[in-house]
A protein has these predicted regions:
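Active-site activation/catalytic loop segments of kinase-like enzymes and analogous catalytic loops
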Residues: 233-266, 279-298
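ATP-binding pocket architecture of kinase catalytic cores
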Residues: 34-127
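A glycine-centered beta->alpha junction motif in the catalytic cores
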Residues: 86-99, 146-155, 239, 281-299
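ATP-binding glycine-rich phosphate-binding loop
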Residues: 4-31
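Active-site acidic catalytic loop and adjacent metal/ATP-binding pocket
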Residues: 28-30, 69, 181-233
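ATP/Mg2+ or Mg2+-diphosphate-binding catalytic cores
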Residues: 285-329
Length: 329
């Protein structure tokens, strides 16, 4: 296995691998030109190309607290070996940002605002903007949920997950429809067009392992391999959800997070309406339901049942989160 890494470093990047240490994120490599980390990214080739362009723009605009991605000898943002993609990046601090206090989330919200602001002017051929992606996704998930309900009712017998779906069907269908309407009222299509023109992106994994903290308190951001051409507000909505999940979330805490984020990316009244829609939509529950029924299962997995039950309870926060944001408009 070490021979493969030596080959990747030599033929892909022109570096001599002298020693490698495995970590939870990849292989930290000591080379003839210093330390770097070789990783197997999770994203597609398009998302990796976009991530490369995003990082370049962030650094150009002064946001340097990221893992710089190094191009291959052929100028590509990734190297392909035996069908597997690899990327080479700077080594990030090993300590993750503790997500157990309101103060940590305030720091995270401000860093998120700084990062989104630094993406202005981003232009990438790998960014594929879709003017109605989220509204269409919300409508699609509602349609899928209705089909599952009809199929279950026609069959006439219900397993544990069918019963769970039955319990949450009406309220979550109503919330998904309201969320779709809020995106329309908040001008989602216009916001996408504006972001595409001005430059921006959505990280899609701004949490946990992606947030590293140096001993001096600085926060570094990694895990860009899932970034996409989407409203940056989607990152903020996901981070607010996580704040409520990881702490005893309060309205005051959310207001403070919005204020910290807004120092760098001011939030308009229409932005707040879009946030309401994103927070109200039961994203995790509907995604897991779709995943489960698309597998054409023959038995009910206890693990999946637990995941769905936990997601259903977690999504109950959506109405409260929407009300908190509405109160700030």
């Amino acid at each position: 296995m070490e021979e493969i890494y030596e080959k990747i470093m030599r033929e892909g990047y022109g570096l001599q691998l002298r020693h490698g240490t495995r970590t939870r994120t990849g292989l930290v490599c000591r080379t003839d030109r210093g330390l770097c980390e070789l990783k197997k990214p999770r994203g597609s080739t398009d998302s990796l190309r976009l991530a490369f362009d995003v990082k370049k723009r962030l650094r150009e605009n002064g946001f340097a607290n990221i893992s710089r991605c190094y191009p291959t000898l052929e100028g590509e943002p990734f190297y392909r070996q035996d069908g597997t993609l690899y990327i080479l990046e700077d080594v990030l601090p090993q300590g993750t940002l503790a997500e157990d206090s309101a103060e940590a989330f305030l720091q995270g919200a401000e860093t998120l605002g700084e990062m989104h602001a630094a993406a202005k002017g981003l232009a990438s051929e790998a960014a594929h903007w879709e003017k109605n992606r989220l509204p269409q996704l919300y409508a699609k998930r509602r349609s899928e949920l209705a089909k599952v309900r009809r199929r279950n009712d026609k069959r006439g017998s219900y397993d544990a997950i069918d019963l769970l779906l039955l319990q949450y069907y009406e309220p979550y269908m109503e919330r998904a429809a309201e969320a779709e309407e809020l995106l329309c009222r908040g001008g989602y299509t216009e916001a996408i067009a504006r972001t595409a023109q001005e430059g921006g992106f959505c990280h899609n994994a701004y949490k946990g392992e992606a947030l590293r903290q140096e001993t001096d308190g600085r926060i570094f951001v990694g895990n860009f391999d899932k970034c996409s051409a989407e409203l940056p507000l989607a990152d903020l909505a996901a981070y607010i959800r996580r704040y409520f999940k990881k702490t005893e979330g309060t309205a005051a805490g959310i207001s403070a997070m919005l204020e910290r984020y807004g120092r760098h990316c001011p939030l308009s009244e229409r932005d707040m309406i879009l946030l309401q829609g994103m927070l109200l939509y039961p994203e995790k529950f509907l995604r897991l339901v779709n995943e489960y029924y698309n597998r054409r299962r023959t038995c009910v997995s206890p693990a999946m049942r637990e995941r769905l039950a936990a997601a259903a309870k977690e999504e109950l926060n959506g109405t409260r989160l929407k009300s908190i944001i509405a109160g700030g408009c």
